[in-house]
């Protein structure tokens, strides 16, 4: 279910681009000439501003828009102080065994996990099926490509124009990474909770999440990694080879072939 959302801008100089974006996403366009708290026709707006493309909730008490941002805030803090290859996500994909892995992040969302993997030297291909999220992600990658510290990292991130189900089986990846939408109950920061609330409200749960595992297993050369909240069932009721447990969630790892057999 996708709650009502339209593309909007307050900038006359961006109106033409915003209309084209709305058309490409099959969404209404709104030229915004009033504060978000007074907008009632749409639950959310995909705002095109000089800062980029962000999603904003409308109505009374509307918070600031959410953007894909790889250059500041929590994402940048993790890049600089996140623990490197000692992080659970690094161990889950196998970076403790081999470097420079090719990874397909088939449920990219805001691209945070993909960015972490790219920071650690992986070549990451990203899939995002929801049009407005993909537009935000593309915008965030574009803006980051001009940042002196981050440009080299995002150069290792490639946003695909297709979903995982449309990828040719001959296009293999060392690792396929899945993080399907699920009703998380973790103790995230207020900012992270706001972002996730947006996407759960707008996009809803991934109803076909179980079917993604089969596609992932066909495309992965060495392993499939599934990120799950604590207490969540196995994807497609398929027991993993092993698990890595964290404070608020876990990684289910499906090993197809040992990474030790990957030629250097």
UniProtKB/Swiss-Prot annotation:
Binding, S-adenosyl-L-methionine: 112-113, 128-129, 179
Disulfide partners: none
SUPFAM superfamilies in the record: S-adenosyl-L-methionine-dependent methyltransferases
Record keywords: Cytoplasm, Methyltransferase, rRNA processing, S-adenosyl-L-methionine, Transferase
GO cellular component terms, semicolon-separated: cytoplasm
Gene Ontology MF annotations: rRNA (guanine-N2-)-methyltransferase activity
Subcellular location, record wording: Cytoplasm
EC class (word): transferase
Entry's EC annotation: 2.1.1.242
Catalytic activity, reaction form: guanosine(1516) in 16S rRNA + S-adenosyl-L-methionine = N(2)-methylguanosine(1516) in 16S rRNA + S-adenosyl-L-homocysteine + H(+)
Protein role: Specifically methylates the guanosine in position 1516 of 16S rRNA.
Family of this protein: Belongs to the methyltransferase superfamily. RsmJ family.
Stated name of the protein: Ribosomal RNA small subunit methyltransferase J
Source organism of the structure: Marinomonas sp. (strain MWYL1)
Gene name as annotated: rsmJ
